[in-house]
Amino acid sequence: LSVSAKEKEYILFLSSVNAEEAWIHGFRNELQKRFPYEGNIELHEYFLAVPVLTNAEEVKQAQDNLLQTFPTPPKVVIIVGDPGWLVSAPIFDGPWKNIPVILCYSRGRVPSTLQTLLAKTPLTEANSIPIEEFNKNYNITVLKQPYYIKETLTLIKQLQPEVNRIAFISDNRYIST
């Protein structure tokens, strides 16, 4: 970033994964259309790549890298995916306290510990907490992406009545389900 870019106000697009995810690419492009670089406020992006983080030291390094890349706090942070929020939340306890956060694509429950997140353990009542509980001390708005399972199955049945079996395929990542 140039000196002038660092001095300009900006919104930070913070992704849990990488730019190669098709829907993240589309979402990012839509945001970029609305924040042209010659405007009064810029849109910057950062990709945490949470799926490759394996321990607390790597998480701390990711947090430090984020703060080093953006030493001036953003006006707002848009976070895609609750794993990115869980990894970056400690920054909002300190240097970025009270910075507004918009969290997109969050689950109703999140890992109760960093270790649960990093272990990629399936969430249960015992190892997770409601997202509202995790968020209670932050200036955050959560945009939930509902599942329309019943509606989707009904639509499939209407469009293709000959279909008798459907395979549900997932790689156990919320964003890819």
Question: Residue spans of the language-model regions?
Answer:
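Short hydrophobic alpha-helices and adjacent helix-cap/hinge residues
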Residues: 2-177
